[in-house]
Design a protein with these regions (language model features):
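Surface-exposed cleft-lining segments at the edges of enzyme active sites
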Residues: 23, 27-31, 58-62
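A short acidic, amphipathic alpha-helical/loop segment
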Residues: 42-46, 105-106
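Gly/Ala-rich beta-loop-alpha elbow adjacent to hydrolase catalytic centers
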Residues: 32-39, 43
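Conserved hydrolase catalytic core segment
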Residues: 45-54
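Alpha/beta-hydrolase active-site loop
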Residues: 1-25
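Surface-exposed acidic, glycine-flexible loop patches that form ligand/cofactor-binding
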Residues: 22-25, 77-83, 158-159
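Long, compositionally biased intrinsically disordered regions
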Residues: 112-114, 148-158
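The feature captures the conserved acid-bearing segment of alpha/beta-hydrolase catalytic domains
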Residues: 53-145
């Protein structure tokens, strides 16, 4: 990330990419993170360790370990005390995706305010209904236009 920001600052100095660096490291307080699935897990992991401007999670995190009884248990890092205040966290997932229960549990463990969470409920668009995918509702929050207002909500509030 540092190398990318340095490169962008050299190539486009008028864009002030260097403002996202501080003492040669990411200036996390000026950086917003967002991701889908594994990308959301990475965004959450970073936001737990650094105070960021905002973090938006789609359909994740659902990192887990299996207990002796073969039960999925959230990874410890998810419920660990974090650096980013809860009011800067946003998340959304579809109620019919395979890991919906674990995602809901993760959002609670991360202390995301309930009014910052969107649970998507609409059916798949007709073109996606016969795809044969094992988890067809995973990703609806980022690609289905019916949720444009929810995505705008996630982006629209300043901390």
């Amino acid at each position: 990330l540092v190398k990318l920001l340095q490169y962008l600052d050299r190539q486009e100095p008028q864009q002030r990419w260097g403002d996202y660096l501080k003492d040669g490291a990411p200036n996390w307080g000026r950086i917003a993170l967002a991701g889908q699935s594994q990308g959301a897990g990475m965004a959450a992991f970073i936001a737990q360790r650094h105070e960021v401007a905002r973090v938006i999670l789609f359909s994740s995190p659902w990192d887990f370990t299996l207990t002796d009884g073969n039960v999925r248990q959230l990874a410890r890092w998810v419920s660990a005390p974090g650096k980013t205040p809860p009011e800067r966290w946003y998340g959304g997932y579809h109620e019919r995706e395979n890991m919906a229960g674990l995602i809901a549990e993760a959002y609670a463990a991360l202390r995301i305010p309930p009014d910052h969470i969107r649970v998507f409920r609409d059916d798949l668009p007709p073109a996606q209904q016969q795809t044969g995918k094992r988890n067809p509702f995973h990703g609806q929050g980022v690609r289905n236009p019916i949720y444009d207002q929810d995505r705008a909500f996630f982006l629209g509030r300043s901390p």
